[in-house]
C-alpha cells in the first residue's frame, strides 16, 4: 500500500509543524500504516520561479509524484496572521490537478499558539 504523505505546511526551518508531522508519522507507524513526512522547507527553489507554473522544474516532478502516489494526505497547517502560510498555497498550486487530490482522503491539523488553535488556518484550505 502506498504511504500517507504528511505535509509540514511551512518552509520555516525547525518549525513546530515539522515536529507535529513527525509525531503524526509515529502514530501512523504504531498502527501499522505506512507514512512519510514532507516538509515545505524541502521545496526546491526553482518552484518559486515565475516560469515554474508553465513548465514544472525537474526537481519538482519527484515531489509531485509522491503526492499523486500517496494513499492520502495529512497536512499540518500553522496559522500565520489568521490564515495559512502562503508557501502552502504555492505548494498546492504547483501540484497536478485533479490527480493529486481526486478520490484521496485529506486531513488537516491546525497548529497555533492563540486561543482559536488555527481554526481559520484549517478552514480556509478546506473550502
Question: Where are these predicted regions, by residue range?
Answer:
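N-terminal beta1-alpha1-beta2 submodule of the flavodoxin-like/Rossmannoid cofactor-binding fold
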Residues: 1-97
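Short, conserved loop/helix-junction motifs that constitute active-site signature segments
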Residues: 98-102
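Short, glycine-/small-residue-rich phosphate/pyrophosphate-handling segment
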Residues: 104-127
Amino acid at each position: 500500500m502506498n504511504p500517507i504523505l504528511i505535509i509540514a505546511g511551512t518552509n520555516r526551518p525547525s518549525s513546530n509543524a515539522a515536529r507535529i508531522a513527525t509525531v503524526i508519522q509515529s502514530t501512523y507507524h504504531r498502527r501499522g500504516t505506512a507514512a512519510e513526512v514532507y516538509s515545505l522547507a524541502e521545496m526546491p527553489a526553482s518552484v518559486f520561479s515565475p516560469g515554474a507554473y508553465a513548465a514544472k522544474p525537474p526537481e519538482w516532478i519527484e515531489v509531485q509524484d509522491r503526492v499523486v502516489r500517496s494513499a492520502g494526505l495529512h497536512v499540518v497547517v500553522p496559522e500565520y496572521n489568521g490564515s495559512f502560510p502562503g508557501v502552502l498555497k504555492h505548494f498546492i498550486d504547483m501540484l497536478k490537478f485533479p490527480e493529486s487530490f481526486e478520490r484521496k482522503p485529506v486531513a488537516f491539523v491546525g497548529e497555533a499558539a492563540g486561543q482559536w488553535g488555527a481554526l481559520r488556518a484549517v478552514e480556509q484550505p478546506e473550502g
